[in-house]
Amino acid sequence: MAIAKRKPAEPVRIELKKEDTVKVLTGRDKGKEGRVLAVNRETGKVLVEHVMMIKRHTRPNPGKQIKGGIAERESPINASNVLIVCPGCHKAVRIAHHIDKIAGGKARRTRVCRKCGQTLDRK
């Protein structure tokens, strides 16, 4: 019997961007806020500053100038477990999208807070 090949997973649509401030909704770090350091759309995970800290044991390698010991670093968390924090109302909110007309007949999609309506995108 032949084994069926698994299809590659489709990239997840994540509304978060690097440098966004987010609040963790579930898990051992529930309630913590932090900046997004990286977004991985293939796995649907985000790396949040000072959230899901893990200890990494490394061996010393003098040839590569690596000092051994126990290093703490962030571990990725599922993007569905965080919400963006609105700079206007200072709450974890869902995101809406508005389409703004710009010069030349083009349109720009901006992220907007659903509660207060403030734009979440940086200029």
Curated annotation (Swiss-Prot):
SMART domains xrefs: KOW
UniProt keywords, alphabetically: Ribonucleoprotein, Ribosomal protein, RNA-binding, rRNA-binding
Molecular function GO terms recorded: rRNA binding; structural constituent of ribosome
GO annotations of cellular component type: ribonucleoprotein complex; ribosome
GO BP annotations, alphabetical order: translation
Pfam families linked to this entry: KOW (PF00467), ribosomal_L24 (PF17136)
UniProt cross-references to InterPro entries, sorted A to Z: KOW, Rib_uL2_dom2, Ribosomal_uL24, Ribosomal_uL24_CS, Ribosomal_uL24_KOW, Translation_prot_SH3-like_sf
Protein task: One of two assembly initiator proteins, it binds directly to the 5'-end of the 23S rRNA, where it nucleates assembly of the 50S subunit. One of the proteins that surrounds the polypeptide exit tunnel on the outside of the subunit.
Family, per entry: Belongs to the universal ribosomal protein uL24 family.
Assembly: Part of the 50S ribosomal subunit.
Protein name per UniProt: Large ribosomal subunit protein uL24
Organism: Solibacter usitatus (strain Ellin6076)
